């Protein structure tokens, strides 16, 4: 009887401990260790790339910096884990990272079968093709019989197979796990075509020996909504990551920038006051301070600032806003209201 009671007691204690850990969740873990562990690419200029001093920057990096600003009031409290396409989901599932912000496409399978949640879209992309100008090709429909370089374990690999089959063209896949291996193989002439998300083509072209000798073809063959990913079952962390991105988008729409956010603390616009934490208790609902969005905007900037700084027309990538412009300016970028 005593053994039974002891076993029941131990079982209850273990259940309570497990429940406590589950309740604590990722946000509590992040606060305890003092930083956000962010999964990023192994080097994609404009999105997640480290300079010679190891400082990370990019559109995806800014999401992680925004999360850190919301949690700690300090956007620098982030550590980065470079991951290949094959490694990224396992790293998130295992708890090696807190959030994956790595040019990752939101698909039905990834959202429903891997135990993961996508927290929004920070870049609307589409798959494209890059070739050498000397090939004399002006359309992807002229690529029949080509050798195509791509990454393993990506939607890119699946999309290219669908595209060539749908257009009754033969092709050969030359696939690698790491992006630098793909770029290197293409640069050395091991394949005729390099395919990935179009934003990635512009970014990786900068790494080629003679970047001006290559063109991105006009066809976009897929929808690739890219965004941050978290584990399922932790709604508090999911909400925080989701609303970090939403705050940046809302800030751009309201005209709140890193330069003017201090003056916005006395705005007469109720929506702005809610955004910067002067009205409402939205930070408390997220488990952080009510100045969470103010800190994001002050230290990282709004979505438009992040886009322009990392991938916009004045950067080496030179990407126009296109569909990533605000809904009010001809694009589809849109966030729910903070109210």
Could you tell me what each predicted segment is?
Residues 37-46, 56-71, 105, 125-181:
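Bilobed "Venus flytrap"/periplasmic-binding protein-like clamshell domains
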Residues 16-24:
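Sec/Tat signal peptide C-region and signal peptidase I cleavage site
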Residues 65, 69, 73, 77-142, ...:
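Acidic, polar ligand-binding/catalytic clefts
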Residues 31-32, 68-76, 93-97, 105, ...:
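Sec-exported extracytoplasmic/periplasmic mature domains
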Residues 28, 61-69, 90, 94, ...:
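Solvent-exposed, polar/charged alpha-helical surfaces in well-ordered, non-transmembrane soluble domains
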């Amino acid at each position: 009887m005593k053994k039974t009671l002891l076993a029941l007691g131990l079982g209850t204690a273990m259940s309570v401990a497990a429940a406590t850990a589950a309740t604590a969740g990722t946000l509590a873990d992040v606060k305890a260790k003092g930083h956000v562990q962010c999964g990023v690419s192994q080097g994609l200029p404009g999105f997640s790339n480290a300079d010679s001093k190891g400082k990370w920057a990019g559109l995806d990096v800014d999401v992680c910096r925004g999360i850190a600003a919301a949690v700690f009031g300090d956007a620098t409290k982030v550590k980065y884990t470079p991951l290949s396409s094959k490694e990224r989901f396992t790293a998130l599932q295992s708890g090696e990272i807190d959030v994956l912000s790595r040019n990752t496409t939101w698909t039905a399978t990834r959202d429903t079968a891997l135990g993961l949640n996508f927290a929004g879209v920070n870049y609307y992309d589409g798959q494209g093709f890059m070739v050498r100008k000397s090939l004399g090709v002006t359309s992807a429909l002229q690529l029949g019989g080509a050798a195509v370089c791509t990454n393993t374990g990506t939607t890119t690999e699946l999309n290219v197979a669908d595209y060539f089959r749908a257009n009754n063209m033969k092709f050969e896949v030359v696939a690698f796990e790491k992006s630098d291996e793909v770029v290197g193989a293409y640069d050395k002439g091991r394949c005729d075509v390099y395919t990935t998300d179009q934003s990635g083509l512009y970014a990786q072209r900068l790494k080629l020996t003679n970047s001006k000798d290559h063109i991105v073809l006009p066809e976009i063959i897929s929808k690739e909504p890219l965004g941050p990913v978290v584990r399922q079952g932790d709604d508090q962390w999911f909400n925080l990551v989701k609303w970090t991105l939403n705050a940046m988008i809302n800030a751009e729409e309201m005209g709140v920038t890193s330069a003017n956010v201090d003056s916005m603390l006395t705005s007469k616009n109720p929506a702005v006051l809610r955004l910067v934490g002067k009205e409402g208790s939205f930070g408390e609902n997220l488990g952080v301070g009510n100045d969470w969005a103010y800190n994001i905007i002050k230290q990282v900037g709004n979505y438009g600032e992040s886009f322009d700084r990392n991938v916009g027309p004045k950067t080496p990538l030179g990407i126009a806003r296109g569909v990533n412009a605000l809904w009010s300016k001809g694009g589809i970028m849109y966030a729910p209201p903070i109210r």
